């Protein structure tokens, strides 16, 4: 039996069905902290479903998801909330919360043992995602990109300090760059790489293959003819696979910075 990597977030043989519809089939991944992993695939491939299973938000119909080799359900939601933060696709809220209120929600799991720097944590998280000026604004009056940056600040605030026991921390992000302008896409991905360098596991659903190629250490590709593919970004994201999964021919080009990107069409 394979030994679980300490701090690893994994799923094995996961299938998710709703009625007769299969949302995800036979998905097995093992993720280790300190790396940026991009989950890629065409629409409907099951990317968000896989992320929700890894977050412990969705119980798989078959298979299991684990953290440190233990079922996510065994950890319990209060404990998981101290170790993983989820940024969903949908960013609207039902009440008139301000941007600062939303970021403060990231500190809610720590309410039983607050630190002395709670206000500073929120301020620094908002500065990192360039939303300080938006603090008093009602979230639902913001643009999609502004909302996304507020929710990213919330996720960062939730995981701000390393765990006293050294346990791994995980940022699980569903299309964090989809609504962002070009500059904020790259600043957000650089920020996520910086957090990975601090030992945080970063898992992001992305649609932009060039962002994944530039910033992700590894990719999980759904929708390939041979099934799920996981591995180092440069090894997996080859033109033949891209054309097979997305049905788009592409040409790799290397920029002046040495990073390979893709031209499509």
Language-model regions: role of each:
Residues 63-71:
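Conserved ABC transporter NBD signature motif
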